[in-house]
Regions:
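Active-site-proximal beta-alpha core segment in soluble small-molecule metabolic enzymes
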Residues: 43-209, 235
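N-terminal capping/small domains of soluble enzymes
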Residues: 2-96, 339-358, 364, 386-387
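Conserved active-site and cofactor/substrate-binding residues in soluble primary-metabolism enzymes
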Residues: 23-30, 54, 118, 151, ...
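Glycine-rich beta-strand-to-loop/alpha-helix junction loops that act as flexible
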Residues: 175-177, 210-220, 253-256
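Charged (often Lys/Glu-rich) extended helix/loop segments that serve as interaction or gating elements
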Residues: 6, 11, 248-399
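Short glycine/threonine-rich loop-to-helix capping motif typified by GTGT followed
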Residues: 181-187, 219-232, 259-270, 336-339
Length: 399
């Protein structure tokens, strides 16, 4: 069990404390600083805010830049005060109206990614029309719908004087998440290094920046192999320092930076045994809780059972229970055969490592259940509610 410094205050503060998310900002900042310390000067961090947009404001203290992938994410940055100079405006779909707004409002500051020839044309034409030159990174495809084919990149670089509204600063690459070792990262980085060298020899293009998404593994489940973060980052740093490319490396990370700081707190609201199978019903379920890689509810996440006063329950023999949510679908099984200690109504279950994606990935509108409250926690400031519960029935009806 982790030390849940927030749980007593949550119980005292709210008559019905669940369901709720709690994000431990002290833990988040401590971890991000540790990551940057391990990397040293070999790379800078860029927070991919899609992992958890609620952490955008707090992340401003510990990361230099933010990857922003939609107009909605951009508006969040505006509201919390992220300077345009710290934004990498990414995303596979960019429409001219949005680009017109950003460029005319912020004067061409920030960095923009190019995901297609059309992207390049939109960005260039808008910048030229507004009398400015903007900085762009070209995303290299990893073989899916994202990014630009290498053959097209070669042509863009060769014809770069045809785009007077953009300054091509370098390349961006991201192929996926939850990579369990460094072998794929090594292959990708070596290929990018070679490609950058070819662009220089073929077209005299000197890349200044390589933005790379490593996709480090987060061990969500008890049977996952937990590697020492310092060792992993130390080995990764060696990979970076072995590259021929000596420009600035920016590491785009979301899940890896955010996952550990988050907790989902839910309560037991019903218990039953059906055909010799014991079931616990919780006041939250798959609409609130999503672990990447969970398969048929068979994998056991890190979760602690507490009594109504917030004390861990440890006495007596463990019993295996199926933990189910409040949705009217047989799919709402969070974990099968999870060990509990004499569960009772109103016992609290705290699921760990939900700082990334769960807060936005759930099927929130299904069955018009309310959205959970969201809290920030710090040792010095205690709990602060940053979003109250939201009734979703208003979004699921005509009036």
């Amino acid at each position: 069990m982790s030390s849940y410094g927030f749980i007593k205050e949550l119980i005292e503060k709210e008559h019905t404390p669940t369901p709720a998310y709690v994000f431990d900002l002290d833990r988040m900042k401590e971890f991000v600083k540790k990551v940057q310390s391990c990397l040293g000067e070999s790379a800078q961090l860029c927070y991919a805010m899609k992992a958890n947009p609620f952490l955008t404001g707090p992340m401003m203290d510990v990361v230099p830049t933010f990857e922003v992938c939609s107009p909605g994410e951009f508006r969040i940055c505006e509201r919390v005060g992220v300077p345009m100079e710290r934004i990498v405006l990414s995303g596979v779909y960019k429409n001219p109206e949005d680009m017109e707004y950003v460029l005319s409002t912020y004067g061409g500051k920030g960095v923009y990614t190019v995901e297609s020839l059309q992207h390049l044309q939109i960005l260039n034409d808008t910048a030229v029309r507004l009398g400015m030159k903007i900085t762009v990174l070209i995303r290299v495809t990893s073989g899916n719908q994202f990014g630009v084919d290498e053959a097209d990149i070669r042509k863009i670089i060769s014809d770069r004087t045809d785009y007077p509204g953009v300054e091509i600063e370098g390349l961006q690459f991201y192929s996926g998440t939850q990579k369990k070792d460094l072998s794929q990262m090594k292959t990708e980085l070596e290929h990018l290094d070679e490609f950058i060298g070819e662009l220089k020899s073929e077209s005299g293009f000197e890349a200044q920046v390589l933005e790379y998404g490593p996709g480090f593994f987060v061990p969500y489940f008890k049977k996952d192999k937990s590697e020492d973060v310092e060792n992993i980052l130390s080995e990764f740093r060696v990979l970076l320092e072995s590259l021929n490319f000596k420009g600035k490396v920016v590491l785009e990370m979301g899940r890896f930076l955010a996952a550990a700081c988050g907790y989902y707190v839910t309560s037991i609201v019903d218990m039953k045994v059906n055909k010799e199978q014991p079931y616990v019903i919780m006041d939250g379920g798959i609409n609130h809780l999503n672990y990447y890689g969970q398969a048929m509810a068979m994998k056991q996440p890190y979760c602690t059972q507490l009594d109504t006063e917030g004390n861990e329950k440890t006495g007596g023999e463990e019993e295996s229970w199926n933990l189910c949510g409040a949705l009217c679908t047989v799919s709402d099984v969070v974990v099968k055969r999870f060990p509990l200690h004499k569960p009772q109504l109103h016992d609290i279950l705290v699921f760990e490592r939900v700082g990334a994606y769960s807060v936005t990935e759930g099927i929130y509108l299904f069955l018009s259940r309310p959205l959970p409250r969201i809290y920030f926690w710090t040792e010095g400031g205690g709990l602060r509610m940053v979003r109250d519960g939201v009734h979703t029935d208003l979004l699921n009806s005509e009036k």
